[in-house]
């Protein structure tokens, strides 16, 4: 429903602006000449409404940006089954380039990306100090280090008809990617005497899935690295239809409905590395919980829809 509202409002705004422009009796006509170029900025409100960022590909990303409930659980911490459809959306914000090859045809390309590194830290009790002095208030820090990236590139043809207010439509190829990895650092170390050290509560409640990993030689484990989805890639076909209005010489605003009817997506190997105390060998060890060797997705349909609101300058 939110997607429909965003699309409807965007197109109505574009249509109203175009209608006002066409009713101006003495309006001048500005159209790009063959051989001219344009640079612009595009905004996709559907991607913004869906939270379609690279962080969405990680359950830790959901943990960092989610909302805590009364029981301490973060809403949205679980992976979303439809998260691969984020790849079928053009970036939330992108930069585009046009080259007017013919009077009613132009080559168009765009690129948009996002990324970041988050080092989220919290204090926990210092177990060693507490063992020596139960009244100790000493603390150490745990950290969740999230490295994520994402973006998209499009290249295709755009056709137009009209003057000041133009009908535009086109098609082309889209490549998109998103994801990352998560690393953990702990202030309290695992030892023979302290096999279940105090750890950031949010890690144990929202991230640690050791209980379902199937490891039998560790009674407790905590994650040290989570390659949860990793960087996934998608290649697809896009088509769009919309309007472009030249509100002044060499400058235009536009709105298009974008559709990605088909896309092939690739998800790399997925795994989590845990550390714990090996009760059979009497030493701290790591366990690699391999979740998936990699997956392939075929996304198709008319629901992979978005909107692009653009501002271009021709020269």
Where are these regions (language model features)?
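Predominantly the C-terminal beta-signal and adjacent terminal strand-loop region
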Residues: 242-315
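Gram-negative (and chloroplast) outer-membrane scaffold detector with strong preference
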Residues: 93-222, 230, 234-237, 245-251, ...
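Short glycine/proline- and aromatic-enriched beta-strand/turn motifs that initiate or cap beta-hairpins
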Residues: 22-110, 114, 120, 299-315
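Cleavable N-terminal export/targeting peptides
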Residues: 1-36
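Charged, glycine/proline-rich intrinsically disordered loops and linkers
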Residues: 64-74, 197-218, 278-287
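Outer-membrane beta-barrel domain signature
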Residues: 28, 82-86, 142-146, 160, ...
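Outer-membrane beta-barrel proteins
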Residues: 48-54, 117-122, 178-184, 264-273
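Extracytoplasmic loops and strand-loop junctions of Gram-negative outer membrane beta-barrel proteins
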Residues: 72-81, 134-141, 216-227, 288-295
